[in-house]
């Protein structure tokens, strides 16, 4: 097995949207880093069965909707 080719695997803290947190091992950041989640299993519409709108991060959803507003997908 090759030596020194794998990323550092260390403990980080993951903070959920409700403020609760847990420790896990990851290659994210450095030892003791905090990963704050925007969406987690408790708030994601796919797992909660809700019809919540997608969060528009940086206008991406708005740009997509504007670009494809007239597209119906039907062949003429």
Swiss-Prot record:
PROSITE patterns: RIBOSOMAL_L31 (PS01143)
A Pfam family that the UniProt record links to this protein: Ribosomal_L31
SUPFAM superfamilies for this protein: L28p-like
CC terms in the record's Gene Ontology section: ribonucleoprotein complex; ribosome
UniProt GO MF annotations: rRNA binding; structural constituent of ribosome
GO biological process: translation
Keywords: Ribonucleoprotein, Ribosomal protein, RNA-binding, rRNA-binding
InterPro entries named among the record's database cross-references: Ribosomal_bL28/bL31-like_sf, Ribosomal_bL31, Ribosomal_bL31_A, Ribosomal_bL31_sf
Keyword Chloroplast on entry: no
Cited function: Binds the 23S rRNA.
Family of this protein: Belongs to the bacterial ribosomal protein bL31 family. Type A subfamily.
Self-association state and partner proteins as the record states: Part of the 50S ribosomal subunit.
Name the record gives this protein: Large ribosomal subunit protein bL31
Species: Caulobacter vibrioides (strain NA1000 / CB15N) (Caulobacter crescentus)
